[in-house]
Amino acid sequence: MGERKGQNKYYPPDYDPKKGGLNKFQGTHALRERARKIHLGIIIIRFEMPYNIWCDGCKNHIGMGVRYNAEKTKVGMYYTTPVFKFRMKCHLCDNHFEIQTDPGNLDYVILSGARRQENRWDPLQNEQVVPETKEVQKRLFDDAMYKLEHQAKDAKAGADARPVLQKLVERNMSVWDDSYMANSRLRAEFRQQKKEINGQQELDRQLLAKSSLDIALLPETTQDREMAALMKLQTKSALERESEQRLELLMRPALPGATVTTFGGLKRQKVLNTQLQVQDLGIRRKKLEETTSSATNEKPISLVGDYSSSDNDSNG
């Protein structure tokens, strides 16, 4: 029944086979909305970013594999291979960028609107297998001596790489000789890492709850610890010193002997910083003198009678 889905199409009663297919009869295209610019030689395709780029409009990074609805246009030929240009809009801003195929170098070229993140390198530097160019292939086919030299060079490269490959094979066999123990060690290491990750997440959660923040904390690095230590020893900036001087002037009273209760505890600080004068202690000294004089003027009480005055009266 599945093969009938492509054949069982509805044909209206007024369908005329002389006008061609069903799409031509209805005045539509098989690609529907994707072919709205077909009269300009443009079709809409789903384009996948071949490498990492930066948008020139919003300066954001766009990773390899991000897909866009792109306008595909044929702009030329490289021998018998067509060259296509793709125009698409950035999903983060209103900027458009254009990318064109480069069949000669097996690559894509950015024409406008973006710049490429350079991650290209020479494959010969990391001993990758590089396909031969057309010139080398032609020379290998025509020149027997060059082919012999080429084979000798390949044999030498294989002999140089054989010890390294042998060490890799031996290490792989030693590690996975006992698959149960290797799996146990790997799982134990994973459990230890999971405990450390959960502990760090708990510390981060407590710190965020204490500071009432809703941000994602990155892992602590050595540079962060060094910067935190330098922040403790950092001197105050000119702006901070100016702010402290301005606050000190605002807290200073207008009169020399006045005390101000504003700015929190300024009156107490003023009292502590004021030097006591002699007149401030005069009241206490006066009270002490009055008490001493009154004590000396009072007559002591005696149990023996004083008859000196009566004797004088009688003698008189």
Curated annotation (Swiss-Prot):
InterPro entries: Saf4/Yju2. Belongs to the CWC16 family. Signal peptide: none annotated. Residues 287-316 are annotated as: Disordered. One of its GO terms (cellular component) is U2-type spliceosomal complex. Keywords: Coiled coil. GO terms for biological process: mRNA splicing, via spliceosome; RNA splicing. Residues 182-203 form a coiled coil. PANTHER family: SPLICING FACTOR YJU2, SPLICING FACTOR YJU2B-RELATED. Pfam families: Saf4_Yju2. This is Coiled-coil domain-containing protein 130 homolog.
